[in-house]
Structures are given as C-alpha cells and as structure tokens.
C-alpha cells in the first residue's frame, strides 16, 4: 500500500481514540470549552448515559458566524497563537482537537451567538471530508452543542461502552470535579429528562463549604481541615480530611487541581500520602480537595491529549511544598492548648511568608488575629480549629517524633558545640524567652529589636545557623530521615568510602541514609534542613570533611553541616526574621537567656538621646 494522506474524517476518528474515550470525555471537553468562554451557567442534558444525547448549553461569549466552520476544524483554536502562549497556557483547552474529534464519531451540531450578532448560527460537519454547513438559528447569547449517537459510525468503539448507569456515573463524577474547580459557575445536570444535580454558584467571599458539602458530603465537611499555604509563586489551598477519622468512603474523595485544571498526578498524590502516612493505616488513603496555583511557565500541560497529566519543571520543589503545606495543617490540628502565662508565646510553627495571608477557617468560629506590633504574636495558618498560642518552650513539651516536615526533636538537647551555652532551667519567665519585637531589617541581614525599652541588633544568619544545628543534632531519638525523590549517586575514593562506613551510624542519627558499592555512594535520605540545599555540592564537601576526621561524633558533624548550609535568604524580610526568631525562641530558649558571641549586640541610644537634649 503506498503512502497517502488520510481522509479528514479518518484522521479525526484516530485522534478521537485519545480524546473521546467515553461519553464522560465528551462532557469534559465541552464543559471546559464553556468555562473558557466565560460562562457563568452551564446546563447539561444527558440521555441514555450519553450514548444517545449529550447537550451542553452555556451563556458564554459565543462564537462568531465566520468562525463556526473553523471551530469544527482540526487544530483550530482561539486560545493560543504561538509557542510562548503554549508555554504559559491558562485556558483549559488549547489543542483545537476536541470538536473535530467528537464530530467525527457522532452527529454534532454547534449553535452559537455573540452579543454583537442579531441572530444565532448553527454549524455541523458531515461526509468523508467533514464539510461544514452553516445556517441561521434561534439562540440566546452563548453556545449549545448537541452530540447525538456517539460512536454510531465506529461500532468497535460503541461495543466497549458500559451500561447506561455506569456511563452516567462517569459523567456525574466529571461534573463533580468541575463543580469543585469553579465555585463561581452554576452547573445543572439532568439525565433522561430528570434533574440530577444542581450546583449553584457561590458569590465571591461566599460560603464555599455549601457546595463542598453538596459534592463531597457532610462526612468530609465535618472532618475537613482548611489549607492556605504559600511560598513564592506557589500557592496551595483547599481541604484535607483529618486522617485520624478517615473512612473508606471518605478515601474516595481525592481531587487535586493545578491552575484550575483537574489532574491525576502521582507526584501530588505521593506528597499528600507521605504527609499523612504517620496517621494512616497501611490500607487507608487520605481524602482531600486541593488547589495548586503555580506560574504557568513552570508547568507543562501539553503531555497527554486528554490533559489529565502535567509535568512540573521543579518537581521536587512542588512535591516538598505540598508535603510541608499538608503536614503543617495536620500538625496544627493535633496541637492541644495548655495553660498559658499572662503573655502569649509564639505559635508552634509560623508558616514562612504566609502568616498574614493565612485563609479564614470556614469550619469553626474565626480566631481573633493579633497584630504583629507592638509584640510578636504570629497569625495562625488556617486549619479546622483556631490554633492556640504555643505554651512556654520547655524541654519536656514537644511533638512526637516522626513529624516529617516539622523537623523537631522530641526533647531538644543542648547544642553539642564545645562553646555552646549551658541549658537554662525549664521554667523561664515569659519575657526571658523572647528576643523582643522586630522593628526593621538593617543591612539586609540584621534585625533591629526592641525589648523592655532596650534596642539591640541580631545577626539573622548566625541565628539561622544555631537553629539548624539544633534541628540537626539528635536528641533521645535520631533526626528523621526524609527520602529523596531522586537519590543522589556520587563516585568516591577508597579513603572517602572508608570514612563514610566508619561514620555511617553517626550519619544515621543525623537523618542521612546512604548505600555504598565498589566505587559509588548513593544518598537516599537527608534531614529536612538539607532538602532545599544543593546536595551535589554539599554532600561531596561533607564526604571530604569526614575523610579528614578520625572521630565521628554526631554533634560535631551537625555543627559542620550547619556552618556550611547555604542560607535561603540573601535579603531578609520582616516576616522571615519574625519566623526565624519564633523558631529560635521555641527550640533554643537558652540562646535568649545567654546569647553567644556574634548573635546579639546591644545598641546604646543614650549618647544620641543626650546629644538631642543638649541641642
């Protein structure tokens, strides 16, 4: 058989094999087109599970008469025009294949009208060459698509359709997912002339939990913990069910969205599962409805024709971001308030760059948020309950080991640095455990502090280094090892391999897990403070340091690592400084009582005050 160009209908039918799997696939593509058109109301009529009829009517912007024929052509779209558009796609559709593919395996009719037109127009394609016919019609502003007799001309595909009930259940599930993505759109679904679902739009700032409860059920709503988590261009919001009360029915609720697009992403699911693993049984699954917002340039949605999958350019960053966001809410929910002193103490884990932006809790009475000034009291992240301020930081009151991203030790031990200050008595006055309030940032890396009328300067990089050393130093139990998404394999010399084997037990206490063979070592896990570091540089330097040592003490290794970690902040902000000091005050209370050299320097204002008075 000679090489020849396929007829348009056959080419479209082949493409339909990827795009149009079943009636639910048709509904998904058409409803997404309606959303891209700006519709605020979408009516969906289904007959016989979608095999007989699928009708989608919307009140979107409509399609102009002279573009109707193009709308049914392959690779015709109004959503992108260049590679730059594709690399920053924000619309749900963009491939220009859906309508052509659907019309090649069904009897499709497209009726539309724009606000500028006086009348509506109807288009349909037929014949081997898929010629489009356009004629006048009666229709309000918006678009209606009718898909009749799906797979009527491809019997092999039609016989693979399941029962009417099964196919409609798939459609119902698709609509549930879309309704969770767009709270601002009214969606009505009917089957065989009977209204089955009515999802009314929620006004801006309205009670989204109403639709959440209607879609996911009251059982999920009662256990839902609200999430609002942000870092740079990444934002995670939504709800995750309390894993301590997860049931098999709740475990079926697993919805995730990337920039408003519903996804089935293994990386996202793995991050959520890993965050919940300490609280879930081996046969349990987490329940969640989560929305990830990311810079469109950092995600590739052009992976599969059905657009079910995405690729992240920085997959490890996204994984760890979701991991930490979910875990922070789960741990906050577990916190139990204890009797407090007269003054509130810092919260357990202030969320970096997200404290003020933390979302309101829709599932409990709103907590009163104290302002940052005149005294630091961090705003809680949103969760299922108002978070109580953390009680006085005492060695005997810490969370259980295994809180993967909290990197807290069960009993913070004194830092094993030769010149470290002696630990103080557990019961400290409230004021003695605070550096004071942050007034401003000086020279990009120093915090100007005020406490009891006294002014001082604190070196933020030094405080960060001390904090990391405490986080890395094992207490009664080893530091938690966090598995690397992609293990790091390095070539080592015989001397380096010997040093690693001698230091293996000490490294294990620090949360560093590796496996060695003849000439290589594979780093499989590291503690949390190392996850965001450039391990390709840090680990070889650590191996070189170990090769020069004769004694391998975890405290000394932790001290070396803390001194060689790169700071995450070249330019410190007020929020970052406040977060750091809250962690230091909680984990290293001895530093507040007896600051080591290079950390804190008092500023004498008396000469300046005297000079002003002498003027």
Swiss-Prot record:
Record's compositionally biased regions (Low complexity): 378-391
Pfam families, per database record: DNA_mis_repair (PF01119), HATPase_c_3 (PF13589), MutL_C (PF08676)
Entry keywords, A to Z: DNA damage, DNA repair
Source superkingdom: Bacteria
Region (Disordered): 363-397
SUPFAM superfamilies for the chain: ATPase domain of HSP90 chaperone/DNA topoisomerase II/histidine kinase, DNA mismatch repair protein MutL, Ribosomal protein S5 domain 2-like
GO biological process: mismatch repair
Stored Gene3D superfamilies: 3.30.230.10, Histidine kinase-like ATPase, C-terminal domain, MutL, C-terminal domain, dimerisation subdomain, MutL, C-terminal domain, regulatory subdomain
Coiled coil regions, renumbered to chain: none
InterPro entries cross-referenced by the UniProt entry: DNA_mismatch_repair_CS, DNA_mismatch_repair_MutL, DNA_mismatch_S5_2-like, HATPase_C_sf, MutL/Mlh/PMS, MutL/Mlh/Pms-like, MutL_C, MutL_C_dimsub
Gene Ontology, cellular component aspect: mismatch repair complex
Molecular function GO terms recorded: ATP binding; ATP hydrolysis activity; ATP-dependent DNA damage sensor activity; mismatched DNA binding
Transmembrane segments: none
Protein family: Belongs to the DNA mismatch repair MutL/HexB family.
Its biological purpose: This protein is involved in the repair of mismatches in DNA. It is required for dam-dependent methyl-directed DNA mismatch repair. May act as a 'molecular matchmaker', a protein that promotes the formation of a stable complex between two or more DNA-binding proteins in an ATP-dependent manner without itself being part of a final effector complex.
Record protein name field: DNA mismatch repair protein MutL
Organism listed in the record: Escherichia coli O157:H7 (strain EC4115 / EHEC)
